[in-house]
């Protein structure tokens, strides 16, 4: 009797292997399995945004002009959110609101949900692309982990916040001036600048910018001479064995400046990763809190004293009055369907007026 020992082999024409070979082939633009999610979603999100900013009005949802066709420019055009009355409807083209009518779908704000959802999945696909490529070339996955910060901010601001409110109407519209309006809304209705999570986010983003500037300048300052003056772009190559700059010199310099300095490149670069990503995640957590209408810091004692004493005012109490003004003016303008009317005497006035 003959016993054959060997490994079971798949059919040569296995569909998965064929797809895997084609998707992960070495080409100018890597596709990969993540590309099946990234490329279609990014295409539809960008295409929807360009279509909306070029042709689609916001008259039916916000009472505004928002397209190039109506006279807007790059800074004022936007794909605006659906009307407040549509709540959290996905606004599918074939749904009960538009009933397959593309023009009606655009008028109702269907492009916003289209761009928001495809944009979110495109960002997730881009993160998966970094995971996939890192695994293919045997890198650690910190690029993908870092990109989770922008994804967290996008999802919290554009999806989770309006889900916690009465509808998509209260999310930001996709446009430059529209985002600015949303920032003013956040300040007026949530006192966002006094929120500790916003403070951590600002510290993370600006701290990362500072670290990046310091790091780049320090490396440029400590380049080894190579016979070509200060320019090392032609003298050094990617596979060189020696270092391009002197970490020891950089350490001595900053030790004299601050009294402390990074002595380890790994800790230095991890810190440059940790600061901005943590800041973005903290901001995202703060926005999730705002979705639930959690309040920022309140210094009630100062408000009470300012109300009782006309001569007492702080920057905090002035900002609270400013927030009241934002709410009074923005609510009437931004939610015309509510028919809000504020008489002159109820609009906030500071003690100095």
Curated annotation (Swiss-Prot):
EC class name: oxidoreductase
EC number annotated for this UniProt entry: 1.10.3.9
Residues that bind pheophytin a: 130, 143
Protein name: Photosystem II D2 protein
Residue positions where N-acetylthreonine is found in the record: 2
Organism: Lemna minor
A molecular function (GO) term: oxygen evolving activity
TM segment ranges: 41-61, 125-141, 153-166, 208-228, 279-295
